[in-house]
Amino acid sequence: MGSRTGSREEHSLQFLNLTKMTTTTASNLPWVEKYRPSKLDELVAHEQIVKTLTKFIENRTLPHLLFYGPPGTGKTTTVLAAARQMYSPTKMASMVLELNASDERGIDVVRNTIVNFAQTKGLQAFSTSSNTGTVPFKLVILDEADAMTKDAQNALRRVIEKYTDNVRFCIICNYLASIVPAIQSRCTRFRFAPLDQKLIVPRLEYIVETEQLKMTPDGKDALLIVSKGDMRTVINTLQSTAMSFDTVSENTVYQCIGQPTPKEMKEVVKTLLNDPSKKCMNTIQTKLFENGYALQDVITHLHDFVFTLDIPDEAMSAIITGLGEVEENLSTGCSNETQLAAVVAAFFEAKRLCVKEMKNLEIEDMEF
């Protein structure tokens, strides 16, 4: 009797430990995965693409797909949501093959992994809102396919042709030009544009409310600015800031990502337009580099500010050309100090070009 009681208590303890471990694991999920939409109707953007895919699924006429567009715009999420709508949860693993071509980019992956998966046929029961039937094909999701070699892409083209009866392919990439025309012509193409801010805000506010975070209005604006239409960046930056600070504000967001704030950049632009070259160098080094900011990030923000300046086109061209050359030089490993001097020189050239039309380039009253 005592042995049975002890065994029961031990079993209960194991169950409690398992439950606790499962809860902890779920709470430790990155928010970008925790709040990833699982159904097509949960997506916040690309309404026309969702409607088209839903129609394909309902009619069981899904073609080969080619999703392209900037990172964080919902390409992978969309195809995974479509897969969940086609296949039951217990059969997803056997019916869907997801590969990241940036890790496995050679021809061997096509010849071995993909071909072995495509050779076996399977019938999978699935359900939609209106009917129940079978899907007589598997799904291969090839993410970041623009990293594949040309030989691998040509081999993939032959596999797509050979196994069309058994498999549907979804090719995902950032740059359409990196995909060989032979694959493009065999797929239905969908372009995923950067998300509009008004579509990001409801999802952002939902996460803030669910996680019980404190977020200021300027903090929300900062998240939208740094994301540039990338939902993944919004969520990852929000989580990082929330883990590091009590309040998500403009200062804490920029501090978390290690980039200069708009206020700091405005001071830099004023310095570049009004101060002597030596003072420019000293001021920028003090304000930016001592705070650990990278010159590459400074160039990116300068580019945004330059287009707000009311200066002649010739002067604008001189600045943009100079910044472009600096960015290229930085990518090849040139020193920050030398390239900072080149940035100062570009602004001084712009001032020289417009000195006849504008005696003073003060921007105290300019709004950014």
Curated annotation (Swiss-Prot):
Keywords attached to this entry: ATP-binding, DNA replication, Nucleotide-binding, Nucleus
Binding site for ATP: 69-76
Keyword Transferase part of the UniProt annotation: no
Gene Ontology CC: DNA replication factor C complex; nucleus
Localization annotation: Nucleus
Annotated source species: Caenorhabditis elegans
Xref: InterPro entries: AAA+_ATPase (IPR003593), ATPase_AAA_core (IPR003959), DNA_pol3_clamp-load_cplx_C (IPR008921), DNA_Rep/Repair_Clamp_Loader (IPR050238), P-loop_NTPase (IPR027417), Rep_factorC_C (IPR013748), RFC_lid (IPR047854)
The keyword Nucleus is annotated on this UniProt entry: yes
Homology family: Belongs to the activator 1 small subunits family.
Assembly and binders: Heteropentamer of various rfc subunits that forms a complex (RFC) with PCNA in the presence of ATP.
Function: The elongation of primed DNA templates by DNA polymerase delta and epsilon requires the action of the accessory proteins proliferating cell nuclear antigen (PCNA) and activator 1.
GO BP annotation list: DNA repair; DNA-templated DNA replication
UniProt protein name: Probable replication factor C subunit 5
Listed Pfam families: AAA, Rep_fac_C
Main location: nucleus
SUPFAM superfamilies: P-loop containing nucleoside triphosphate hydrolases, post-AAA+ oligomerization domain-like
Family annotation (NCBIfam families): PRK00440.1
A GO MF label: ATP binding
